[in-house]
Amino acid sequence: MNRFAYVEARLSPNESFVSRDNRVKIYDGDQKTDFEDGEVVLTTHRLFWGRPGEIARAAVTLCLPLSYVISVSEETTASNFFGRKTRIIMHLHPPTSDKGPGPLDTSRATHIKLSGKNGLSVEFHSALRETLNARVWEILLTSEIIINGVASSPTLEPANDRLARIQKRTGIGGIERHLEAKAKATDENIALAFQDLSVLMAMAKDMVGVSKTISSKIRKQKGEISDDETVRFKSYLMSLGIDDPVTRDNFTSNSAYFSSLARQICEMLLDPIEEQGGMMSLADVYCRVNRARGLELLSPEDLLHACEQLSGPIRLRSFPSGARVLQLESHDDALIAVDTLEKVEAAESLAVEELAKQLGISLLLAKERLLVAERLGKVCRDESVEGLRFYPNLLLGRD
């Protein structure tokens, strides 16, 4: 990011507009920046990035001279539930001494990334490569040398060839070639869309089942869905996906990767864990997280390492039975025991499966809740041929 400078978004003499794209964010190396959802404009000499409307007003925006660019490459990442999006990686020369002030004075990164909500357009990517190959900023300098009488130098021939190629883009022939390239890009977009559609069709059945399950749960609470429940239903659907999942490729060390992954898991699961009574088994966590990450699936080992680093409102807990859960930090054993005792007293006695059905949790979590209450003396068990049941501990009421 220390190659960018703040300049007014105005074309200089002999500079021409080439292409633009919207909703673009910039990465400083592999790290995210605050420059998101902006408009990027490519000219023959520079690359501009500004907030929506800033470039049109000729306001002060970020500007990267194309002379800094060494090469361009791509990386492909997952896009929400299905499909993939492409990021552009621009490898850069060190900043020159005459560079103006910009967003950063120093940066260890030797490249930047441009990423869109659903990937950058094929047209923009193609225009960027053609512009960098043409190197018009060098051609204009060469033209000045030619005017000054040194056109006979053999070192100028490659630049003249490039100038001729640029000139071929003008006129009726240039317009026809541009329309042909645009039609080809449209065909590629349609082909990619059909690939995404096939993935969507394969997942549609599961998605419809999930939405029906959520809807039926809300309808069981009341006869009709209120406005508050509609908002809650939308929040359920929003929780099904992660816009930009944390991946190992963006980090140079395992500790930074697992720390960032732990923060994302905490943000994603805080509300669902609260709604499930303060605990969620690791099996449920694994399913929820990977369903939300789409194609960027986590291994069980990575998930466990990330959960072990949780230190905020959620923490990893191991029960004496060996079961592991994510539990709210404020949800200690005393609260679990009191809440479980209330459920047992209301029903006079409860089996594990009855408590699981009543709270809408797994059998594993229901059993651990009853065992916690038993260890604290709130309930006592009765094992018989009919199975295991828990009763209120009547000795607590004696003086």
Curated annotation (Swiss-Prot):
InterPro entries: GLUE_dom (IPR021648), PH-like_dom_sf (IPR011993), Snf8/Vps36 (IPR040608), Vps36 (IPR037855), WH-like_DNA-bd_sf (IPR036388), WH_DNA-bd_sf (IPR036390). The keyword Cytoplasm applies. The keyword RNA-binding applies. GO terms for molecular function: mRNA 3'-UTR binding; phosphatidylinositol-3-phosphate binding; ubiquitin binding. Ubiquitously expressed in the ovary. Residues 111-144 form the GLUE C-terminal domain. Disruption phenotype: Multivesicular body sorting defects, with large amounts of ubiquitinated proteins detected on endosomes. Bicoid mRNA is mislocalized in developing eggs. GO terms for biological process: bicoid mRNA localization; mRNA transport; protein localization; protein transport to vacuole involved in ubiquitin-dependent protein catabolic process via the multivesicular body sorting pathway; regulation of apoptotic process; ubiquitin-dependent protein catabolic process via the multivesicular body sorting pathway. It comes from the Eukaryota. Residues 1-94 form the GLUE N-terminal domain. GO terms for cellular component: cytoplasm; endosome; ESCRT II complex; late endosome membrane; neuronal cell body. Keywords: Cytoplasm, mRNA transport, Protein transport, RNA-binding, Transport. Its main location: cytoplasm. It is found in: Cytoplasm. Signal peptide: none annotated. Component of the endosomal sorting complex required for transport II (ESCRT-II). The GLUE domain (GRAM-like ubiquitin-binding in EAP45) mediates the binding to the 3' UTR of bicoid mRNA. Component of the ESCRT-II complex (endosomal sorting complex required for transport II), which is required for multivesicular body (MVB) formation and sorting of endosomal cargo proteins into MVBs. The MVB pathway mediates delivery of transmembrane proteins into the lumen of the lysosome for degradation. The ESCRT-II complex is probably involved in the recruitment of the ESCRT-III complex. ESCRT-II interacts, through the Vps36 subunit, with bicoid mRNA. This interaction is required for the anterior localization of bicoid mRNA in the developing egg. Belongs to the VPS36 family. This is Vacuolar protein-sorting-associated protein 36.
